[in-house]
């Protein structure tokens, strides 16, 4: 699964829906993709965000950086969709690449970027 910023924030607030999804992912050895741009939106005080810190330390959690290749893909996706949210576009790019569903609290923006994404709304 690929997480956007919303579920990362919800995890930090101990949202049961997000906790359960992550527990299931762990039980089934499913990778958890965290786009770096989504992490940047969610992280504010790493020393106080213990739940988020634990997620990031899990062996199956992968933080995907916004490198040159992804930045180019993000720019193309934003141009094609007529939208402007870099983090959402990066989430879409990461989910496409990993062929995973996206866990989100804001499905409308992601659907505008890519209507083919498999979204799980929390």
Language model features with spans:
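Short, well-structured N-terminal submotif of metal-dependent ribonuclease cores
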Residues: 1-34, 43-59, 120
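Alpha-helix capping/helix-boundary segments
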Residues: 7-8, 38, 70, 90-91, ...
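Acidic, metal-associated active-site segment
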Residues: 42, 85-101
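Short, polar loop motifs at secondary-structure junctions
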Residues: 47, 105-109
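Acidic catalytic patch
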Residues: 60-81
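Active-site regions of enzymes building and remodeling cell-envelope glycoconjugates
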Residues: 61, 115-122
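Short loop/helix-cap segments at secondary-structure boundaries that form the rim of catalytic
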Residues: 108-116
